[in-house]
Every structure is written in C-alpha cells, then in structure tokens.
C-alpha cells in the first residue's frame, strides 16, 4: 500500500454520467489531494495531509512541485501496427487529388497493406512498441489497436499476433481489434461479399482459436464495403461472439444506423452523420467516437460532437493514429482542437478520453479516480487542470503511473 501525492488538484472524473453534456462545474476536484493505492488499485482519494495522518506508517510516493493528477487516458481507436509511410498521400491530397486518384496512383490503404505484408513480425513489433511508448508518454495507458493492413489470412494473423506479443513488452493495456474488413484486397478474386464471407469462414475462426481479438471492425463506405453486405457481415461476426465496432459515416451518411441496429459497441468517425442519425445514435448505447486526427489529416469537417452530446449521446474521442488519414498520433492536441471547433467543455473532452472511451472498449474498471478503479494516472506540472487542453498538447505529461507504478 502507498500514498501518492500531494497534488495541487486531483480531477477524479468520478460521479459523472456516461452520456450527454457536461459542464466543468460538475467536475470533482480534490485540492491538495493524495491517492492511496494497493495492489494496483485505488483504495481512496482525499486530502493528502488527512490521508497521511490516517495511514501514518504508509510508504509515500512524493510528488514534487505543483502538479495536477487525472485518470490516465484511453485511446479507443488506432491503427498503429503498420509498415511504411504515406507522406506522398499527404502531398497528393494537398495538390488536389481525390481519394480515388491517390489510390490509383499507388497510395491509399492498399499501399500500407503492401508495406505491412512485407514487414517481418519483428519489424512490426519494434515499430508498434515505439508508437505505444509515444502514446504512453502522452498519458495514454489503454490503447486499442486494429489489424486491417494484412487483408489475407497470413498477414491479418501476423498483425494480431504482433499486437498480442507487444502486450508482453508493455504495461499499457492493449485491446486488439480485427479489421480484416478494411478494404477488399486487390489480390482477392471475388466480390466484396465473397471477401466478407471469407473473413467469416477463414479469418475469424482462427482469430478466435488463437484468442487474438474479441472485437471486429468494418469500414462501411462507398470505397470499401456497402451497407447491406456490411450488415450481414456484422450479424455473422456477432453470431461468432465478437463485439462490434464500425468505421461509420466518414464521407457518406447511413452506416451509423447500421452500427446502432446491430448493437455495435461504438460507431467511429461520423464526420458526415446527418441530424436524424445523430438523434438515433445518441439515444442508443453505441458510443459515438470522434476522430479529430482524421479530420485534421484529411482537411475534412469535424464530427458533430456538440450535437451528439446535446442529444444525449455517449461521446468518446480517439486518435485514429494511422499512416494515411491521421499520422499525428497526439490525442491531446487533437481533442483540444476538437474542443475549440465543436465548443466542448473541458469536462466533455476529459470524459471523452477517459471513462467514456474506456466504456467503448468495455472496460469499466478505469477512467475515473475512485475506490476500486485501476490506478492508472497521469500528472501534469501545472496548478490548474484547465491548462492541459488550453496548451493544446504542448504541456507535456509529467508522470504516468500504471497499476500505481511510475513508468
Ligand atoms: O480510420 N477510414 C478508414 N480507415 C482509416 C484510414 C486508414 C488508412 O488510410 O490507412 C481511418 O481513417
Ligand atoms: Fe480508423
């Protein structure tokens, strides 16, 4: 057992609703606080001096200077297992080329597939670990990672095995997702419906047998998979007992409806979601995940986060870190920028990258600082929590704790 502190402020994010809008006045802030940790779990939060007096023999982990402590963040949507780089896509986009033109000139998702197929497991493991460490340094200790750059049995399994192996090298929690339905691979001879059936018959059973992922994702879009075939695929994946998440409404609306109808845990992107569908989504238990990094990467509009919250939806915010649409990999910067464009309160943003994004991954043991929760913490050297988003990511995390231990 040990006591961590003192903190100028502890922002616990406790006792807040899972859904809907939040104001900063609703935030519980413990000033001059301490956190009591036992076996990786929070036992108590409260006034540091009082806790020290109550547990006089206890080991102390002293915090220097004025610092603010929050629950560590959860990035619930990334594609950080990939080979190569797509800087040329960026140049082509800025020269006015369309998505299709870029794909035709050798860029796009398919080019990342070719690089990822070429990479060995060891090479992929090294790069994914570097990206994981970079996320940890931002205060993110729970990271979802998708496959989807293999797109055949061998390479999809390779990606998921790499993610599984990465877990044995990091204290961060990694949540793998099978995104074999990212795109119909160019070397698959058959229709996209046949490819989706191939995933059901040939990939998912192996994913299950090796326990490589419990979640299945699909990119529903004109350039990827159409709504009806996607719905059938998702229902079959559900029958195989996978949890569902969807790349929905990125450029065209309609697919968030499918996500809700099949009971997806989350619908992610939503840049193009129409008002009617926002209402539908917001009334459901499907988490609406904004990916501001993709809006910034592509120069597209932001997810209507304000409308989603006002309609009572569960809003998470994630980085979408990938080599194509979202190469930045800085969730704090992206979430801060989303706040300015969508007029979000600090409380709404912090909820979106802590307990609400953890909920999107079915992890209800983290994301707030209260008794019984996982002692994953992030601290910032500042006297006021508002400064974290105000500086748009340039105020760096000072300490990161996982299970109560500094990493
Ligand atoms: O979430 N939209 C589809 N998939 C990714 C992009 C992946 C890529 O371009 O490599 C996304 O933005
Ligand atoms: Fe994505």
Regions found by a protein language model. Give the residues of each.
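N-terminal metal-binding scaffold of metallo-dependent hydrolase/deaminase domains
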Residues: 1-54, 385-387
